[in-house]
A protein has these predicted regions:
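Electropositive, glycine- and tryptophan-enriched low-complexity nucleic-acid-binding patches
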Residues: 1-53
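Acidic/histidine-rich, metal-coordinating catalytic segments
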Residues: 53-67, 96, 104
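Short, conserved catalytic/metal-binding motifs centered on acidic residues
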Residues: 5-6, 41, 60-61, 104-107, ...
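A short helix-to-beta-strand connector/capping loop
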Residues: 54, 82-92
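Short, aromatic/basic amphipathic alpha-helical patches
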Residues: 68-84
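C-terminal anion-handling pockets and recognition modules
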Residues: 90-92, 99, 103-152
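Conserved beta-strand termini and adjacent loop/short-helix elements that scaffold enzyme active sites
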Residues: 27-28, 94-98
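Aromatic-rich, lipid-facing transmembrane alpha helices and their immediate juxtamembrane interface loops
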Residues: 48-51, 73, 78, 93
C-alpha cells in the first residue's frame, strides 16, 4: 500500500492571518505509478476549486511517478485547460534537488505521523493502517485509488 499526500496551508482572513495546515491523503493498493499520480492531482485540484485557489504548488521529490512524461503531459494539458476556460487552479511543480527530503514541507509531518500509527505488538491490516493514518492527520478516509490493470 502506498499513500499520496498534499499538505495544504491555509491562511485565515481574520485579523491575525493565522495559517493552519490540512493533510489530504489518498491510499493506493499497490505501487504508485503515473496513472495514479494524475488521478491524485485531479482529485486535489477538484478539492481546491471550491476554495477559489488559483494554483497548487507541488514540492516534489524525484520519484519516477512524479517526473514521468505521462505526468508532465497531464499537468501541461491541465494548465492549458485552466488558462483557456478561466476555471480551476494551475499546477506548479517545484522539483526538489536529489536526496534532499528535508526541503519538502510534508516530510516532518510524515515523520511525526508515522510514530503515532504503528502498533508495536502486531502488524496492522492495510485498512487499519489507513484508518489510523487518517485519524492522526484528521482527514477523511477516502476510497483507495486503483492501479489500472494495464500497468499493474
Amino acid at each position: 500500500m502506498a499513500c499520496y499526500g498534499v499538505l495544504v496551508r491555509w491562511w485565515d482572513r481574520g485579523p491575525y492571518h493565522d495559517p493552519h495546515e490540512e493533510a489530504w491523503l489518498r491510499f493506493v493498493d499497490g505501487r504508485p505509478v503515473s496513472a495514479i499520480t494524475t488521478r491524485f492531482l485531479e482529485w486535489s485540484c477538484t478539492k481546491l476549486a471550491p476554495a477559489g485557489k488559483t494554483a497548487l504548488l507541488l514540492v516534489w521529490d524525484n520519484a519516477s511517478w512524479h517526473l514521468s512524461h505521462e505526468v508532465r503531459r497531464w499537468i501541461k494539458a491541465h494548465n492549458r485547460h485552466v488558462r483557456q476556460t478561466g476555471r480551476g487552479g494551475r499546477i506548479v511543480p517545484c522539483p526538489l534537488p536529489i536526496k534532499s527530503p528535508w526541503l519538502n514541507p510534508i516530510e516532518p509531518t510524515w515523520v511525526h505521523g508515522k510514530g503515532k500509527v504503528v502498533a508495536p505488538d502486531r502488524l496492522l491490516s492495510a485498512r487499519e493502517l489507513a484508518q489510523r493514518v487518517c485519524a492522526v492527520f484528521r482527514c477523511p478516509y477516502e476510497p483507495h485509488l486503483a492501479v489500472p490493470k494495464k500497468v499493474a
